[in-house]
């Protein structure tokens, strides 16, 4: 028994010894790290430090699924837009997941636009992502010993009118490494857990396909096909810490923000299950350790290379935003950051055997300067950031020399792949990192001094040249340090880093480095001036003594030359005056003053179209002055740049031509307007060009260009005669009788119908004679005026004050009426002889003649003169008197001298200057304004209404009126009033689109006074045109305009109502149109209109209301028209705007039936 027990004991002892040996062997295998042997690289200091640290106890091999250990092969990337992304290194860099972080991008700044001035040199402020501030003056980038924390805590350093606000915010995120699910988010407001059922990742079952079969290892799924949810006990978690620093500077009085910047950075930490620590790596995970990651920061490119074969690129991935940071796991399953600045050396380390490449620098760059979304920012290396923090502490204590702050000269190295070296798998297969980039010979793209200056100026001005690009920089210590130790490892051998320096520069740099610097010298500007956008630092006024002397001397010389030329011009003006002529001045324009001024009016007796004075005036002296300018060498820009095609007629205040540009061969509408000499009147005429230039709407005539011309006197008139000879038929006399070739009065009466010049030839303003009665065709304008003012046959005289254009227009109307009633006048000659009137027209220059008690300041004159016409009734005394009055029916025109003196007592007149040569008046040269506009069809909306009946218009009324209202709405939104809306001012473009033109009467709403005089008051001018507020076509003017009351933009609504009515009603004759519209203004609608158009009738009641406040606005009008006329809505799906315009043009073309195809009018 004893022997059996002893045998059992010995057996147990052997078993325990064997178990102990096995345990020791296993412990040795576990302590030995096979990854270092398989990876084939020596152990680094960080790995030794990590290996020496104690590991927490845990279970071995607790997780068998490969996807649970996916953190070992992921690459974490932080981009500038604030997102954190994960790339699978083993899956050719495929994007595993990407999560955003708040509150937004890592950079949001306006401080880079803050321009400070240091002794006349601009200084640009650039923030860094770590919270620091740098200043750049074009020569160097210098750190400022101020951070965001200092700005928020030390407000006493700034001026009293600046308040600093902001803060530092930290947000933490928990992200599942395997699924990319956002587990929680913690901020100042608390933590939000996203693992509830409603916020969990959306797991759906999809039909298995080839893509799913290829990505079986992409996500861990259960038997039912669902993605396995995050397990906090088994899955790894990435802790993302987002630190954001925000600083805002605002004015203490107004609260206006001067500048701001907000920067942020990401910090990552990997949390693994505490029970699963000692897990072996498989072959795929061991291969991941052999991958070297390189980064192209500005382009967001990640490149993976093999450590064993550095020239072989495994894969590449490109982000849409620049890269800020990158992390991966090491052999100890711990996160380690990737040095982005080592990528600058990596480019030159790829091909060390190439003799053409210079030696690469041995130290990484210090900072990176980039631009993102037009915002400059800086990233520092860890070494430089620590050095700046140490020097900042010294600066705050004021115990050290501030010159020890690191200085970074402007010697950039491009960080873009467009200047990288070619990487080759073999000698015949070049491959670039950036697609589309081209390299030659495998060499670096060097920077020279010119490229340095261009890049520096672009950064200083924050231009688009550097937007999306980036540069690396070295500090002065990095550039100078290797020269003292070893010249072979000098990084300045690279052409992209150094530039040749002269011995003088070297000496000055050495002096600067060893000299003493103050705080302001180190900063380059005072801290009190950082709040100002632009400030100039001037130590003394004597600093600019050279500039002051040059400016004073130059100003004296220019002033002396200008005054000398002005005196010479004045002398030349007086030298042309040869003689004086006595002229009687008038206080009031009456018949007595006219006779005293001119003497008895007698018919001309001298043949040959010359003036004949009475014998009593034979002793009067005559003067002669040559003021004519030769037009032989004058060149008109209109004639040199354009080829005249035809005259389109009158528009606004001038003549409209169709002309083809000789350069682009396109046809345009050119409007020519004569500018008045009076400055206020000239500005009102220029208003049309300025209004067209400021309007950009598809239903308003397009404006291209404008210019002015000042031809010699008589040159433009001669060109107009040539034009008329070409345009008009030979049956019409086109020659304009002037003052020197005036025919006899008897011949004028016989040839009155043939000696007409079309009103649109002269560039005078439209006739705006005031009359509440509209002149109908066939009625005499002279009869209307006589009836309006209740003229009596026994009245002695009538004196009318009109501009030249008004007199010309009135005479043209009289002549037209005389032609129509010629036969009737012959039958009733006895009656008409009693009413024959003789008139004397006196052309007085408004610039030099003054009539008291007459206010002409508000009269808008296109010409610089007006006429006094003395109209006397005909007496039936004798035949001689009848003949005399017949002869005086055509007015004589005499030009009085300029600069008359008032003679109230009627004594001997004082001599004045005159410019008369051979009986003609020498007028000053006219200034013409040319406006180049879009060429529309010659037919206007008035022609379209005349040639299309109501049934033909029905399909187009809504489309046409909608475009008109849309254009008027745009004009009102710009604060303007058209004031002359009528069918003749609405045109069609070449593609049939509505175009509103003729902005000659447009005005600003703010320019209208609260009170205007009524039309035809007692101020001396019976014309509505005396006020710019009382203009436009009378038939379409609102009641408040006609009554001279205050008005606003509602006058255009009234005109739109009349146009809207015309679109629905067809008029067979012009007489019917005018009578119907005049009745409509009085509230009388045509019979059956309210029955046929009930909705239109209700709308017109509002638009034509006598009370402006009852008229709708354009927005309300468009809303009502949409329901009434069924206006076109948005374009149908798949139909382009061009197709819609083409269809509209075809519809309008089919509806237009002009004279060749229209029905005969009744």
UniProtKB/Swiss-Prot annotation:
Residue positions, PTM Phosphothreonine: 818, 1028
Record flagged with keyword Transferase: yes
GO MF terms held by the record: ATP binding; eukaryotic translation initiation factor 2alpha kinase activity; protein serine kinase activity
Notes on how activity is controlled: Perturbation in protein folding in the endoplasmic reticulum (ER) promotes reversible dissociation from HSPA5/BIP and oligomerization, resulting in transautophosphorylation and kinase activity induction.
Reactions mediated catalytically: L-seryl-[protein] + ATP = O-phospho-L-seryl-[protein] + ADP + H(+); L-threonyl-[protein] + ATP = O-phospho-L-threonyl-[protein] + ADP + H(+)
Domain Protein kinase: 642-1130
Cellular localisation: Endoplasmic reticulum membrane
Domain of life: Eukaryota
GO biological process, one term: regulation of G2/M transition of mitotic cell cycle
GO cellular component, one term: endoplasmic reticulum
Transmembrane segment boundaries: 538-558
Mod. after translation: Autophosphorylated.
EC number annotated for this UniProt entry: 2.7.11.1
Cytoplasmic side: 559-1162
Catalytic residues of the enzyme: 980
Region called Disordered, residue ranges: 498-517, 801-839, 1135-1162
Induction: By ER stress.
Broad class of the protein's primary localization: endoplasmic reticulum
Its biological purpose: Phosphorylates the alpha subunit of eukaryotic translation-initiation factor 2 (EIF2), leading to its inactivation and thus to a rapid reduction of translational initiation and repression of global protein synthesis.
Family, per entry: Belongs to the protein kinase superfamily. Ser/Thr protein kinase family. GCN2 subfamily.
PANTHER family hit by this protein: EUKARYOTIC TRANSLATION INITIATION FACTOR 2-ALPHA KINASE (PTHR11042:SF91), EUKARYOTIC TRANSLATION INITIATION FACTOR 2-ALPHA KINASE EIF2-ALPHA KINASE -RELATED (PTHR11042)
Protein name: Eukaryotic translation initiation factor 2-alpha kinase
Protein species of origin: Drosophila melanogaster
């Amino acid at each position: 028994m004893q022997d059996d027990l002893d045998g059992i004991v010995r057996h147990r002892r052997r078993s325990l010894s064997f178990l102990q040996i096995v345990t020791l062997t296993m412990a040795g295998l576990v302590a030995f790290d096979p990854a270092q042997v398989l990876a084939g690289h020596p152990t680094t200091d960080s790995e030794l430090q990590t290996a020496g640290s104690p590991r927490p106890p845990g279970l071995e091999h607790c997780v068998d699924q490969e996807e649970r250990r996916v953190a070992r092969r992921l690459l974490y990337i932080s981009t500038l837009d604030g997102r954190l992304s994960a790339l699978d290194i083993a899956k050719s860099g495929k994007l595993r997941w990407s999560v955003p972080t708040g509150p937004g991008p890592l950079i949001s700044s306006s401080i880079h636009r803050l321009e400070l001035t240091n002794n006349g040199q601009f200084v640009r402020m650039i923030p860094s992502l770590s919270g620091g501030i740098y200043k750049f003056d074009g020569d160097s980038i210098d750190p400022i010993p101020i951070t965001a924390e200092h700005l928020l805590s030390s407000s006493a350093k700034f001026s009293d009118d600046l308040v600093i606000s902001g803060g530092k915010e930290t947000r933490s995120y928990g992200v599942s490494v395997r699924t990319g699910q956002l587990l929680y988010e913690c901020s100042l407001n608390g933590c939000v857990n996203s693992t509830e059922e409603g916020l969990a990742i959306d797991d759906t079952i999809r039909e298995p396909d080839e893509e799913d079969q290829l990505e079986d290892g992409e996500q861990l799924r259960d038997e039912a096909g669902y993605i396995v949810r995050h397990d906090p006990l088994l899955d790894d978690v990435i802790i993302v810490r987002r630190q954001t620093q925000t600083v805002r500077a605002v004015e203490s009085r107004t609260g206006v923000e001067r500048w701001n910047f907000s920067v942020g950075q990401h910090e990552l930490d990997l949390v693994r299950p505490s029970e699963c620590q000692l897990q072996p790596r498989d072959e795929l995970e061991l291969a991941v350790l052999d991958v070297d990651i390189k980064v192209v920061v500005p382009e967001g490119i990640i490149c993976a290379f093999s450590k064993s074969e550095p020239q072989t690129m495994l894969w590449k991935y490109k982000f849409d935003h620049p890269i800020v940071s990158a992390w991966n796991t090491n052999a100890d399953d711990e996160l380690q950051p990737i040095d982005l600045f080592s990528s600058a050396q990596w480019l030159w380390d790829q091909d060390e055997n190439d003799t053409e490449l210079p030696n690469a620098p041995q130290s990484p760059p210090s900072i990176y300067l980039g631009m993102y979304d037009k915002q400059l920012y800086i990233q520092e290396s860890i070494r430089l950031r620590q050095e700046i923090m140490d020097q900042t502490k010294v600066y705050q204590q004021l115990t050290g020399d501030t010159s020890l702050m690191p200085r970074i000269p402007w010697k950039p190295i491009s960080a873009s792949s467009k200047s990288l070296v070619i990487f080759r798998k073999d000698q015949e297969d070049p491959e670039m990192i950036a697609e589309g980039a081209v390299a030659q010979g495998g060499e670096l793209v060097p920077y020279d001094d010119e490229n340095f200056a261009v890049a520096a100026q672009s950064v200083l001005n924050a231009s688009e040249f550097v937007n999306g690009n980036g540069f690396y920089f070295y500090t002065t210590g990095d550039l100078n340090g290797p020269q003292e130790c070893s010249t072979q490892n000098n990084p300045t051998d690279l052409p992209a880093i150094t530039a040749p320096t002269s011995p003088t520069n070297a000496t000055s740099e050495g002096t600067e480095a060893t000299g003493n610097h103050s705080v302001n010298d180190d900063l380059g500007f005072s801290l009190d001036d950082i709040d100002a956008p632009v400030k100039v630092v001037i130590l003394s006024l004597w600093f600019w003594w050279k500039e002051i002397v040059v400016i004073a001397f130059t100003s004296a010389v220019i002033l002396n030359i200008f005054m000398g030329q002005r005196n010479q011009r004045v002398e030349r003006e007086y030298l042309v005056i040869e003689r004086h002529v006595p002229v009687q001045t008038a206080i009031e324009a009456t018949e007595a003053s006219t006779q005293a001024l001119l003497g008895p009016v007698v018919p001309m007796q001298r043949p040959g179209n010359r003036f004949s004075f009475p014998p009593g005036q034979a002793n009067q002296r005559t003067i002669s002055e040559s003021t004519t300018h030769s037009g032989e060498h004058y060149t008109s820009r209109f004639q040199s740049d354009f080829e005249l095609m035809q005259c389109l007629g009158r528009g606004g205040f001038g003549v409209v031509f169709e002309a083809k540009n000789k350069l682009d061969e396109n046809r345009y509408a050119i409007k020519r307007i004569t500018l008045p000499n009076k400055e206020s009147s000239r500005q009102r005429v220029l208003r049309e060009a300025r209004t067209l230039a400021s309007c950009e709407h598809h239903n308003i005539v397009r404006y291209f260009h404008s210019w002015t011309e000042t031809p010699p006197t008589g040159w433009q008139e001669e060109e107009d005669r040539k034009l008329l000879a070409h345009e008009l038929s030979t049956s019409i006399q086109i020659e304009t009788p002037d003052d020197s070739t005036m025919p006899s009065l008897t011949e004028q009466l016989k040839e009155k119908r043939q000696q007409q010049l079309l009103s649109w030839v002269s560039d005078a303003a439209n006739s705006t004679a005031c009359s509440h009665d509209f002149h109908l065709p066939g009625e005499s304008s002279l009869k209307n005026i006589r009836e309006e003012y209740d003229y009596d046959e026994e009245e002695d005289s009538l004196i009318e004050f009109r501009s030249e254009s008004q007199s010309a227009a009135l005479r043209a109307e009289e002549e037209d009426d005389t032609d129509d009633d010629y036969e009737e006048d012959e039958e009733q000659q006895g009656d008409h002889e009693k009413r024959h009137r003789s008139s004397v027209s006196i052309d007085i220059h408004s610039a030099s003649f003054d009539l008291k008690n007459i206010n002409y300041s508000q009269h808008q004159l296109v010409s610089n003169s007006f006429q006094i016409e003395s109209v006397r009734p005909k007496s039936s005394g004798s035949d001689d008197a009848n003949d005399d009055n017949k002869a005086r029916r055509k007015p004589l025109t005499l030009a009085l001298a300029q600069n008359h003196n008032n003679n109230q007592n009627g004594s001997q007149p004082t001599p004045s200057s005159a410019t008369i040569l051979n009986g003609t008046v020498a007028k000053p040269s006219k200034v013409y304004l040319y406006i180049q506009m879009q060429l529309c069809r010659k037919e206007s909306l008035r022609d379209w209404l005349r040639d299309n009946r109501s049934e033909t218009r029905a399909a187009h009324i809504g489309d046409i009126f909608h475009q008109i209202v849309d254009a008027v709405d745009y004009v009102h939104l710009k604060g303007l009033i058209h004031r002359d809306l009528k069918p003749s001012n609405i045109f069609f473009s070449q593609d049939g689109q509505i175009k509103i033109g003729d902005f000659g009467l447009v005005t600003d709403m703010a320019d209208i006074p609260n009170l205007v005089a009524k039309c035809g008051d007692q101020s001396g001018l019976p014309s509505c045109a005396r006020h710019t507020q009382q203009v436009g076509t009378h038939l379409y003017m609102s009641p408040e305009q006609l009554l001279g009351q205050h008005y606003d933009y509602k006058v255009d609504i009234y005109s739109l109502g009349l146009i809207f009515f015309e679109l629905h009603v067809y008029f067979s004759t012009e007489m019917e149109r005018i009578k119907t519209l005049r009745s409509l203004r009085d509230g009388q609608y045509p019979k059956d209109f309210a029955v046929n158009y009930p909705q239109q009738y209700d709308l017109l009641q509002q638009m034509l209301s006598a009370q402006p406040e009852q008229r709708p606005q354009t927005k309300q009008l468009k809303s009502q028209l949409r329901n009434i006329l069924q206006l076109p809505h948005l374009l149908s799906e798949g139909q382009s705007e061009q197709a819609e315009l083409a269809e509209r043009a075809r519809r309008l073309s089919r509806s237009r039936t002009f004279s060749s195809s229209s029905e005969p009018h009744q």
